[in-house]
């Protein structure tokens, strides 16, 4: 009976916060404590300059909710984006600490700090500083999320440092390479269905709009992207995401200015049981 009550409370919590499970960014909230999530993401770039070929990247990830404040995420990427053949590309580790929580009826506010470290064996291509397979580096940032009933709005700012051997050599690159940047994101999610929550087995339909921007600190270069997405949540534990990301403005050299993303994620509640 206690186990049933615990599961019911957790599932209701997942349902009420579904609209802040963003597709392209992380909210200030964490996955449930002592839970594990497994996720597989596919990014597809259609034929466009400069490569004029269909490129794919697959990212398996594992999320671990250590407690209500700490969360870890580890992943790897496999792709043919920087090479002709499809191969293992990178590994990374992400951690998030929620340091502020303010709860009210049908609303809450969260703030968290996050850090990420990534190693990539991909060649140094393009200006964009991305730790999702493209570059080795470090990232540190802060994120805030506000939930009002069916609407969730989130924003983040982070600093990135690219780590590549060319950073310390004496070669003169034209244009100069980018090793430092600031990332900015603004995301909004809305719970469209169900209109009334009755049971955790109801399918949720969430709509998202996200803005993602990067500004180089080494020279004047930037981009601003827009990423609408749709999300289905089944049994409050399995998520299916579909998004399309495209550039609104910018002057950075990038691998692609638009791409599709599809992902599926399964959460295993109370997988890390407390020792008695």
Identify the role of each PLM range.
Residues 167-169:
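Covalent nucleotidyltransferase core used to form phosphodiester bonds in nucleic acids
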């Amino acid at each position: 009976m206690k186990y049933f009550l615990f599961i019911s409370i957790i599932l209701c919590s997942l349902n009420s916060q579904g609209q802040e499970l963003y597709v392209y960014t992380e909210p200030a909230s964490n996955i449930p404590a002592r839970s594990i999530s497994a996720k597989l993401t596919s990014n597809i770039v259609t034929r466009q300059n400069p490569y004029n070929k269909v490129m794919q990247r697959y990212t398996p990830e594992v999320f671990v909710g250590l407690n209500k404040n700490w969360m870890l995420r580890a992943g790897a990427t496999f792709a043919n984006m920087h090479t002709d053949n499809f191969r293992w590309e990178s590994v990374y580790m992400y951690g998030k600490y929620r340091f502020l929580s303010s709860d009210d009826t049908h609303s809450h506010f969260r703030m968290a700090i996050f850090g990420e470290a990534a190693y990539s064996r991909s060649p140094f291509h393009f200006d964009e500083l991305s730790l999702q397979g493209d570059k080795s580096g470090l990232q540190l940032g802060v994120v805030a999320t506000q939930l009002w009933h069916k609407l969730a709005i989130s924003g983040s700012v982070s600093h990135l440092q690219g780590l590549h051997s060319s950073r310390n050599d004496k070669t003169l690159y034209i244009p100069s390479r980018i090793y430092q940047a600031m990332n900015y994101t603004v995301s909004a999610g809305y719970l469209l269905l169900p209109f009334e929550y009755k049971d955790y087995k109801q399918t949720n339909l969430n709509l998202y709009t996200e803005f993602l921007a990067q500004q180089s600190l080494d020279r004047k270069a930037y981009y601003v992207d827009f990423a609408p997405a749709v999300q289905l949540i089944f049994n409050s534990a399995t998520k299916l995401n579909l998004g399309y990301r495209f550039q609104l403005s910018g002057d950075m050299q990038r691998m692609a200015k638009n791409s599709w993303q599809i992902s599926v994620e399964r959460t295993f509640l109370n997988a890390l049981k407390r020792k008695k």
